[in-house]
Amino acid sequence: MQNDAGEFVDLYVPRKCSASNRIIAAKDHASIQMNVAEVDRTTGRFNGQFKTYGICGAIRRMGESDDSILRLAKADGIVSKNF
């Protein structure tokens, strides 16, 4: 919900799983949030930006988290397409 100034005033904004688009519940203690740094291609140094991926506990329980993170990183251009 937003107020008249356009600021978010909700007390709780749920996260969503980046792989399955499910809402990550507050009691899902198996879920993770991972920041992957963006690196300058010429110097190999961190440029101050990162991509955030959230993986829910159900994906981790099935053992699909590594494949999901790799698929998301390929789609964002962090990992090369032929990796």
From Swiss-Prot:
Matching entries from Pfam families are given as: Ribosomal_S21e (PF01249)
Subcellular location(s) of the protein? Cytoplasm, Cytosol; Cytoplasm; Rough endoplasmic reticulum
Q: Which residues carry this modification: N6-acetyllysine?
A: K81
| Molecular function (Gene Ontology), one example | ribosome binding
What PROSITE patterns does the record tag this protein with? RIBOSOMAL_S21E (PS00996)
* Cellular compartments per GO CC: cytoplasm; cytosol; cytosolic small ribosomal subunit; postsynapse; ribosome; rough endoplasmic reticulum; synapse
Query: A biological process (GO) annotation for this entry?
Result: cytoplasmic translation
Which terms are listed as keywords in the entry?
Answer: Acetylation, Cytoplasm, Endoplasmic reticulum, Ribonucleoprotein, Ribosomal protein
Q: Which residues carry this modification: N-acetylmethionine?
A: M1
Q: What interactions and quaternary structure are annotated?
A: Component of the 40S small ribosomal subunit.
Q: What does this protein do?
A: Component of the small ribosomal subunit. The ribosome is a large ribonucleoprotein complex responsible for the synthesis of proteins in the cell.
- Entry similarity comment: Belongs to the eukaryotic ribosomal protein eS21 family.
Put simply, this protein is called Small ribosomal subunit protein eS21
- State the organism of origin: Mus musculus (Mouse)
